[in-house]
Amino acid sequence: MRTLWIMAVLLVGVEGSVIQLGKMILQETGKNPVKYYGAYGCNCGPLGRRKPLDATDRCCYMHKCCYKKLTDSNPIKDRYSYSWENKAIVCKEKNPRLKEMCECDKAVAICFRENMRTYNKKERINTKIFCKKTPEPC
C-alpha cells in the first residue's frame, strides 16, 4: 500500500503532498489515483502544462496552475492538515501557505469527481506525443 502512495507522485507531476493528494482523490472518486489519473491526458503526470484534451485533463492543468501560484513551498515534503467530514474534504491547516496547497489538492480531487462521466479510458496512459505544447494561460 505504501508503494501505491509513493507512486502517486506521477499524478500531477511532482506536485502536491503525495499521500494526502492520493487519499483525497480516492475519497472523492473511489478510484485508484495512480491507475486512473497518473498518466491521463496531456497534463496529468510529470510533464509541463499542455493544451488540455478534455475536462479530466483540464483538472490536472488547473492543478498545475494552482501550484504555480504557491510560493515558498515544497509540495513533496510539506504536509497539511485536512479531514474527510460528511463526504467532504475540509482543509483545516492554520498555516496559510499549507492551506493554499490543501485547497489546490482539494480542487483537483473534486474536479476529477465532477468529471467522471466524461473520463476517457483511451487517455488513461497517454504518451503525450501528440499533446500541443502551447497551453492556455492560467
Curated annotation (Swiss-Prot):
GO MF term (any one): toxin activity
Spans traversing the lipid bilayer: none
Annotated keywords: Disulfide bond, Hemostasis impairing toxin, Myotoxin, Secreted, Signal, Toxin
Highest taxon, organism lineage: Eukaryota
Disulphides: C42-C131, C44-C60, C59-C111, C65-C138, C66-C104, C91-C102
Subcellular location: Secreted
One Gene Ontology biological process: arachidonate secretion
Site (Hydrophobic membrane-disruption site (MDiS)): F130
Site (Cationic membrane-docking site (MDoS)): K128, K133
Tissue and organ expression note: Expressed by the venom gland.
Signal peptide: 1-16
Site (Important residue of the cationic membrane-docking site (MDoS)): K121, R124
InterPro entries: PLipase_A2 (IPR001211), PLipase_A2_Asp_AS (IPR033112), PLipase_A2_dom (IPR016090), PLipase_A2_dom_sf (IPR036444), PLipase_A2_His_AS (IPR033113)
Record-linked PROSITE patterns: PA2_ASP, PA2_HIS
SMART domains: PA2c
CDD domains listed in its UniProt record: PLA2c
GO CC field: extracellular region
Residue ranges of the region described as Important for membrane-damaging activities in eukaryotes and bacteria: 121-133
Primary site of residence: secreted
Description of how the protein assembles with itself and partners: Monomer.
Family statement: Belongs to the phospholipase A2 family. Group II subfamily. K49 sub-subfamily.
Function: Snake venom phospholipase A2 homolog that lacks catalytic activity. Induces local edema a few hours after injection in the hind foot. Is myotoxic. A model of myotoxic mechanism has been proposed: an apo Lys49-PLA2 is activated by the entrance of a hydrophobic molecule (e.g. fatty acid) at the hydrophobic channel of the protein leading to a reorientation of a monomer.
Name under which the protein is recorded: Basic phospholipase A2 homolog Tpu-K49a
Lineage: Eukaryota, Metazoa, Chordata, Craniata, Vertebrata
